[in-house]
Amino acid sequence: TTPYWVLLTLAFMCGIGGGAFSGYMPSTGYFFPKRLSGTALGLQGGIGNLGMSVIQLVGPILMGFGLFGMTWLAPQTQVKGDHVGESIWVYNAAEFFIPWCLVAAILAFIWLRDVPVKANIKQQLDIFSNPNTWYMTILYVMTFGLFSGFSAVFGLLINNQFGRESSLALPVLGATFAFLGPLIGSIIRMSWGIFCDRMGGAIWTFISGVGMAITLAGIAWVLYNPTGWTDFYIFM
């Protein structure tokens, strides 16, 4: 019964976190020597991305029982699936992380250092006339954009293409595997910074772009007409 505009508002507010993430990434290079900037950025970005995997892993678990101190909130009732009529505490997935978010915000306020801004608003707007701005934007959409987008729809894609309500009707649940995509991506991002420091970021961006193109072509081929468990394993 929740209005759609409420969900959009909540999504927008959560997006502030994504904006803050993108905003502080460029400043990392100011606090580390250039020879270690790839490692620093990889660790910072990878650990940040790891939060997506954590919520997708523990979220379904937290929804299965009433949290201590929060049982005064009425649970929802499942209306379809194998557990019709059973209680589910959907709000637990958000409430559990509220204290951690507050702690992180306080620590950031105390310990993070600001990068001095020397350019005025007009000077900052000059980036839009620089072709490199648009080249980097395209690269960012290709890499992090695809990572975050596919991580968000990974579970839904499994349900729609292979799950019990799909034409294949396999006994698989997207929520069981949803955390794997962002987990693998985050680990690779954390560990690959050191290789970028040694070989350069351009070559690895090129390699990742080629690898993503090949992988996407393979996924499209599998999802075009999946026939059973074999296609599911290939997709995974």
Can you name each region flagged by the protein language model?
Residues 5-19, 230-236:
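Hydrophobic core of transmembrane alpha-helices in multi-pass small-molecule transporters
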